[in-house]
Amino acid sequence: MSTVVNRRSSHQFDSPSNHLDHSSSMNVDKVVQSVTNATKRLSQISTNTNNSNKKRKTQNKIGPWKLGRTLGRGSTGRVRLAKNTTTGQLAAVKIVPKSNFKKLENPKYKRSKEDATRLPYGIEREIIIMKLISHPNIMGLYDVWENKNDLYLILEYIEGGELFDYLIKRGKLQEYEAINYFKQIINGINYLHQFNICHRDLKPENLLLDFNKNIKIADFGMAALEVKEKLLETSCGSPHYASPEIVAGKNYHGAPSDIWSCGIILFALLTGHLPFDDENIRKLLLKVQSGKFNMPPELSFEAKDLITKMLKVNPRERITIDAILTHPLLAKYPEPTVSYSSTTTLDINSINIKQIESVDKIDKEILKNLSVLFHNCDEKTIISRLLSPNRCPEKMFYYLLMKYRNEHLSNSNSFNSSNDVDSARSLPRSTSYVKTTVTDHATGEKHTTVKKIQQSSSIYSNRSLLKKSTSAKGNVLSNITNRPNTPKQFSASSSFNKKKALHSKTQIYASRSRNASSRSLKSNSSTGRNGNNASVTSVNKIPEITGATVLQPIPSMAMNRGDEQQNKTKKNLTGTFGNKSLLNFQLICEEVFENDKENSKPVSKTPVSQLPPPPPPPIETPTSRTNSVKRGKTWSLARRERELAEQVRQRNEARENKLKAEELARKELEQEKKRIAEEKKRLEQQERELDEKQKLQEKQKAALEKLQKHQSAHDFEGLFASNRRSVTDMAPSSGMSSLDPRAHMVSRANTIGSPNLSSSSVNIDENASKVLHKFGIDVAPSPKRFSRASKTSTSKNLSSFLAPTVSRNLSSQLKTSSSKNLAGYLHGTTDTNGSAIAAKKKDNSTNKALTIEEFNAKERTSMSPSISKASVNKRNSNQSSYYRSMFSDNGNDDNVTKVRTRESHLSVQEEEEMDMENAIDEDISLIPNPRFSRFSFGGLLGSNTVANEEGDWTIMNSTLNHSNTVVRRTHNKSSTMLGLGIKMRDTTTIKEDEEFEDEKPFISVPSSEDDEGNTHKNKRGGLRDSGNYDFDEEHSVASTANTEYSDVASQGQQRPGSHTIHQLETELSNFDLLSYRVADIGKVNKHKPSIVDSKETLLKNHSSDEATIEVKEDNNEHDFNDKIKQHYDDNGDSEEDDEDEDEEEEDDDDDDDARSSFEARPHSHNYSLAEITSESPVGGGYESPSIANDFKKSRHSTGIFSTTQFPRSPYVVNNNGDSNKDENSQQQTKHMLNDGHKGLITSPVQDTFGSKKPVESNSLFRRLSLNPNRAAPKAPAPPPPSAPTSSAAKANISQPLSSPTKGHNRFSRISIGSKNMLQKEDKSTKSNWFKKFFHSLTTPSTKEQSGNSSSKVASKDIKIIDTSLTAAQLIRVIKYQLELKKIEGSISKVDIDEEFGLISGVIPSKFANGRKLKFKIEVIDLINSSSLHVIKMKGNDKGFQSLVNIVTFIIKKEEQDKICRR
């Protein structure tokens, strides 16, 4: 029985192995305790038979029920077999000792004192629920009796035993058999759920099988009514079958929990084992909570699908009963046959419930039952609902309880009033419902007792439904369920007072085989099962027990007695059979044998129950022949019974064989269908592959043509808006053949002094060439140089401030003498009608030569918030626009277009284009590399590509930026100021950039660490003094755009004591090949407050070298130094943070370069660019106007994202940019320009730095200089075609480089080789530069280590994929795939910046060939197409190649889909 198994489950909880430690979750502990407490229910109580039972008299008769043998002992005490003495019906009596009621009491529903005599809440609720339900697949409750000591539940007897035992015996079942049982379980549960009743303890131990293998759901000790307003709370049931929400200790809905249990049962039926099982209860509960189990592969697809849906951890996702009933697994098998044709279940939807008239008509006992059923709901609330006109559950349950009461009352009355033999022939109830119609409590039913019911609204008159009989004495029993107004009480007979023969008792204790045989015979009889059947069965079984000695005397007695003697016998017969059992037995024997005698024909197949009543038996002398005939007839009946049983068995076997054959045929058909479907899919796949292959070939061919077209140095016209000039546009050549500032003065002036980057068109100054040859360097075009112009003296630097030339390493050929630059700047501004300033001017008011004062005024204007929008546009147009966000093409194009329209006529741009063309002709490094974003094209496009909003002054200053922001002259191949088109003012970093410093996303301005290097230089004061400081050397590393790959490559070269140089080198190194993090489109560097201490010596000579320069007073210089110091102090923390950030970048491969902007403020004669860091969250509190600063056109190799520091115009203060401040700036400029020994910038990239100690500044920067220790070297001669630089670069390959790739940066005029040369040149001031470089290689430092992360990136770590998809489409596809992989768990730490087309992530080692793979993806928008760069930051090559293959496949697939959509 289920009770035994329940007790075993209870012991599992109590076992020592299940004592839980505090380390485990409190939730599981709570559930374990809750499940343990749940055993205190009726069906789960651990109660052994009381020892007092042995001392007291054993109860053998309960009302009309005669108790028989004990069927089992378990948690409920015991279960005994019983037989109804009037109908012969068998039942199972569950005996619950009242001494255990206190243990059963639920603390939550504790009784009040006046209700102390009532049954425990759990038992009472179980009784009420079983009264309500009547279904062929649910065990019925026949009766409830009680006496002083015990409670008796008369339950339907089910002889087949537990499904659990059957499963243990048979093992896993065939699917058709398992589904047959499962359907019956679901039907029964569905019926329960219609009443909102949940079983909550479904398991094979509580599922019983009758003789015909029909399921009966038993044990409702855990059942509960679920009220809509309230979830169930009790954690109950068996842990193996309990749902996760019950195990988790949550409030839950009962119906989904029952479905979970049914899913476990279905799994067990099909597999023979449980999905969740463990000896340790804690581990078991955790397994259930996880919901993960192994699905056996041999199960059918439908079975797997249904089990999976039923065992969903989330109850909301779990399948419903209705969906289960229509599932294909159940649909493919016929409905189970139910042998209870006489039983009809109640359709609760069609119940016609009559309105209750008043409170007086409400049965008080049923009202109490409803209160218990609804979780001790207040009776007043229930009464109000019963009297309401609307339908409600209370009314339905009231009706059902009333119906149950009337049925059992009529049966009881019938039992009390009828003592004749016919009463034994009434139909026995197989369930709690019979075909009896009950109108309501007022009208009663069609029985003779209707009138008695009307006498009182309650049939319980003076007693409570579940109260002990107080009037009964001793062991007097009371029927507490169906007691009429004058209940009949039965004295309990006991083993001490019974006086009947022992053999009669033996007949009562029939074995289970006898009962099974009896049930078999009755099952195969006609619809009616009456007392005759039971009696005949008893006769048939007598030979098995007593032999002929019992049967032979019976007929003789009947024949020798007359009617009078029979009546006498009828009155006197009493015994263990009950009132009339023995007489019934005698009469049946007479009936059978007399019929046989009268009718010589053999017994027909008509059931015994349909035989006519026997006539009075004739009196005759028995003969041996007669006895022999009758014995033969008896044996014939037994034989007939065996034949019927055999027929049943054969039919069952035939049905099973038929089902097996159907199942086999169905499987074969399914396999054939699957094979056909697979073959069809294979053919379709082959066709698709062929089509895809053809399309791919066509696509590849078209893409190759397109790529070749784009890779051409002369085919970039379609990259930007139509009014931009392409890189290949020929600009009027300046015709310069020399770097002498006096050569081609007019041409230089017209072009704002932009030098030609092409070595073929530039003649390097002879003096400079000699100087370089002294150091063993041939001045030849370097594949990696920013400026191919040669080094110049301070005078040249002065001119380069006005018309900055790119430094040797940044632009070897752009070096010019200061006089030439000065003249170029002055003439350039005049001749171009202020075109260089036009971009800066919003009023377009300058059609005259630009003075320094005017320029300063414009600078101040740009710093003010009033022109913040313009600043954004300038930044977009000059640098950031080259690398537009792939999802904001329109916005970026608008900004660029606006800028272009304001600056369409810039002579400087024309010269830059010309220079670019020359450079392209000379050096293959200028070929566009698709791995750089659109921003990198800025250097390749003609100067017209970017509007020069700052004017000529801006252009020149942009290249003069002293800041470590790597002066990138690359893009504007022209012009001493490769910063053409970029506003001189610092762009302030948007606050996002600062916020990203900690988060390591993408920072859009030069790395704060690098920028702070500027601050140090400024603070050192010695920054760039006359010719002693070679800016090119210092910024040679800046040849490449700042990227995560370069990071801090040159930091390792800095000397420990020279913080300033360290910062400078750091910044330069940070600008590497792919500064793709920097491009902050249209955003202003608000975070890096302008420490406008970096000034640029804008040497203004209006028409030639004879410009008079006035020196500003020393107090300006003091102011400048003070500000520098203040900025340095403010930014100390920021600098440290940035350094730490770089180290983290090395580890995490996130390489998020913190960028900052710079503002130039005139406070000294020398002008340097100070990093605007005080506004950053890390730095200081200084807050420059948002968007007041601007990017100058990138002078870096690629221009990608680089937000280089922008040299400030002299004396540009951070005032609101009012135009009326131009005069002040003019005066300040005069003072500044007159200082002869300070502020002359050696290179276009270099910014001048005001300092009271020019000597110190010389020493500071000399270590980076290639020039000898002299005041002002002359411009060197043009570099020869082959320079040792390349070899030096090769030697330096092993050194941590800023650039991740070898060879040329195709967007840069500087190659890695030249940059390596630069790093070699970064040595101590007095020694040979090569020695210094070698020394830097052999002297490790923390910065060098931090730079290693970027240097690790090699060409093999970058894969370029070109595609016809637009950048937006590409980002969308990749983002979608990454999200899927992220959910799948095969990728983590995904960071997607849609604006800049940057994607990073980490692939765990188990998905990346054993080593964690960190990667980054850059998407470059090429207008009508795009290019994707997959970069390996960390991991093995195999995993990286797999990633590249996957990305390539995704892109090709999307291209094919795109073609198909067309």
UniProtKB/Swiss-Prot annotation:
Composition bias, Polar residues: 428-440, 471-487, 527-540, 1165-1176, 1197-1218, 1292-1302
* Keywords linked to the UniProt accession: ATP-binding, Coiled coil, Kinase, Nucleotide-binding, Phosphoprotein, Serine/threonine-protein kinase, Transferase, Virulence
Q: Which positions are catalytic residues?
A: D201 (proton acceptor)
- What InterPro entries does this protein map onto? Fungal_KA1_dom, Kinase-like_dom_sf, Prot_kinase_dom, Protein_kinase_ATP_BS, Ser/Thr_kinase_AS
Residue ranges, compositional bias (Pro residues): 610-620
Query: Cross-referenced PANTHER family, in alphabetical order?
Result: MAP/MICROTUBULE AFFINITY-REGULATING KINASE (PTHR24346), NON-SPECIFIC SERINE_THREONINE PROTEIN KINASE (PTHR24346:SF110)
Q: List the protein's name.
A: Serine/threonine-protein kinase HSL1
Pfam families from the UniProt entry? Fungal_KA1 (PF16797), Pkinase (PF00069)
**Which segments constitute the Protein kinase domain?**
65-330
Q: In which residues is ATP bound?
A: L71, G72, R73, G74, S75, T76, G77, R78, V79, K94
Q: Which residue intervals are annotated with compositional bias (Basic and acidic residues) in the record?
A: 1095-1130
Entry's Gene Ontology cellular component terms = cellular bud neck; cytoplasm; nucleus; septin ring
Which family does the record assign? Belongs to the protein kinase superfamily. CAMK Ser/Thr protein kinase family. NIM1 subfamily.
Segment Disordered: which positions? 1-26, 41-69, 412-450, 471-540, 598-637, 992-1031, 1095-1230, 1269-1321
Q: Name one GO molecular function term.
A: ATP binding
Q: What is its EC number?
A: 2.7.11.1
> Tell me, what is an example of a GO biological process annotation in this record?
negative regulation of filamentous growth
Q: Which transformation does this protein catalyse, written as a reaction? A: L-seryl-[protein] + ATP = O-phospho-L-seryl-[protein] + ADP + H(+); L-threonyl-[protein] + ATP = O-phospho-L-threonyl-[protein] + ADP + H(+)
Instruction: Give the disruption phenotype, in one or two sentences.
Output: Leads to elongated cell phenotype.
Q: What spans are recorded as compositionally biased (Low complexity)?
A: 510-526
Supply the CDD domains for this chain. STKc_BRSK1_2 (cd14081)
Per the database entry, which stretches of residues form a coiled coil?
636-715
Annotated Acidic residues bias: 1131-1153
**What post-translational events are described?**
Phosphorylated throughout the cell cycle, except for the G1 phase.
